[in-house]
């Protein structure tokens, strides 16, 4: 077993070294997203789209990650252990100022699904027109014309939905059991609608969907219910930095809803400059082919007309590495004093398994590996991706916390250096007319939120 592990480590090390070199190069260009998690074909697509369209690398990478997840949908699951299965469901938010090129990367990544939905809609309209013609006939006339006596109403196949109620979404999902993606240009419209009908019920619907829990929708217009055994709905959209605080209103902070969202917030210092470079013709074709490969995957359907997903377990070395990571991650949770951050960490332990599945299937789609099991390289890449989203979540929490500060408190935070002593904090507080006891309470209340206590009398700012 030791020899096997040694051989595995020897073969994987060059890939890990190459991944780190790629990510270092990406960081030098201003992006923190670990693009090395993707197969070489997708890395090239991201690079070309970034250089030709000036789309921020973080946005295009996150949009592509979500598109891959949607392409997989309910066809594959990751099995961590017996009875513990994870779907590749992602809730993704691209954060930025107006004009930060948030929407265009989404349009690029989702175009293959848009094209598919468009063609399927045309086909549906043709089929529905014929269906209506048949329904205008009597049953006898239909049989005489060689038609089915009781024609089946056609179903519209699709991947994408926009503004829709849980009831409407359940109806669409029942016809598209492979899975859906809620794509909304402004995520604020999504969560502002949570209380539009039944108080809080829509939010509970999305909490259940995240965990792929069975959903039952009782339609007002029918005596029958819509029963979805294992729902798959990913969500992606954009949100402006200045309205982030809207996302944390109500129970969304206390019930863990906000902790389920993956945030992408690149540190864009300048507005993107136009590039006169044209996107090579093959880039869109290559991306279309990758998603089409996922769309074309055959799904096994059982006698109950439910999808039987292909379940991927982990190789022994992959599982060992994932457990090692989780134990280290748990130590971070144990040492964390902020309950909100701990809750975020707990959701990331779920997400990392989903990332492993998406990364393995992306590599398989591009011909870089098989899909018999999730291997060590996919786990290593998922770990780096999880670290990225952990840092993004902490940055978002800091923004939310700073939005709740008084002008006096904000001034003190702004004037404190990245690392400071209690004496330095008192000096800054005195300059801003804050009493010593008030300062000490402010520091203590914000340990793990705005500040980190390094040792007695010494602190550091978390978001510096």
Predicted region positions:
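Phosphate-handling catalytic cores of nucleic-acid transaction enzymes
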Residues: 2-464
């Amino acid at each position: 077993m030791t020899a096997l592990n040694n051989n595995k480590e020897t073969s994987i090390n060059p890939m890990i070294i190459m991944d780190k070199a790629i990510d270092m190069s990406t960081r030098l260009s201003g992006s923190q997203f670990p693009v090395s998690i993707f197969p070489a074909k997708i890395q090239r697509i991201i690079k070309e789209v970034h250089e030709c369209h000036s789309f921020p690398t973080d946005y295009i990478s996150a949009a592509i990650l979500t598109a891959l997840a949607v392409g997989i949908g309910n066809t594959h699951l990751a099995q961590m252990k017996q009875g513990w299965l994870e779907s590749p469901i992602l809730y993704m938010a691209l954060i930025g100022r107006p004009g930060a090129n948030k929407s265009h990367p989404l349009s690029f990544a989702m175009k293959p699904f848009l094209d598919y939905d468009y063609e399927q809609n045309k086909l549906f309209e043709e089929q529905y027109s014929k269906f209506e013609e048949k329904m205008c006939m009597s049953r006898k006339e239909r049989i005489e014309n060689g038609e089915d006596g009781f024609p089946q109403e056609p179903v519209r196949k699709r991947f994408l939905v926009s503004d829709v109620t849980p009831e409407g979404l359940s109806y669409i999902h029942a016809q598209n059991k492979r899975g859906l993606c809620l794509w909304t240009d402004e995520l604020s419209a999504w969560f502002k609608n949570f209380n539009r009908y039944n108080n809080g019920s829509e939010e509970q619907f999305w909490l259940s969907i995240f965990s792929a829990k069975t959903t039952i929708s009782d339609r007002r217009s029918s005596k029958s219910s819509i029963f979805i055994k294992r729902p798959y709905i990913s969500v992606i959209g954009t949100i402006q930095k200045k309205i982030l605080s809207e996302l944390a209103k109500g129970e969304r902070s206390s019930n863990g809803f906000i902790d389920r969202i993956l945030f992408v917030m690149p540190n864009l210092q300048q507005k993107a400059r136009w590039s006169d470079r044209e996107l090579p013709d093959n880039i869109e074709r290559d991306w279309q082919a990758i998603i089409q490969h996922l769309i074309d995957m055959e799904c096994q359907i059982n006698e109950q007309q439910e999808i039987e997903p292909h379940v991927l377990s982990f190789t022994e070395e992959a599982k060992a590495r994932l457990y090692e990571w989780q134990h280290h991650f748990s130590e971070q949770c144990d040492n964390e004093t902020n309950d909100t951050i701990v809750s975020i960490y707990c959701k990331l332990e779920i997400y990392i398994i989903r990332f492993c599945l998406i990364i393995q299937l992306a590599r398989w789609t591009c011909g870089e590996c098989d899909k018999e099991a999730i291997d060590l390289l996919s786990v290593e890449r998922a770990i780096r991706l999880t670290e990225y989203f952990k840092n993004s979540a902490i940055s978002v929490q800091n923004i939310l916390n700073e939005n709740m500060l008084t002008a006096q408190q904000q001034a003190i935070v702004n004037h404190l250096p990245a690392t400071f002593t209690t004496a330095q904090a008192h000096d800054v507080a005195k300059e801003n007319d804050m009493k010593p006891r008030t300062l000490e309470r402010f520091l203590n209340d914000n340990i793990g939120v705005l500040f980190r206590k390094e040792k007695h009398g010494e602190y550091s700012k978390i978001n510096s």
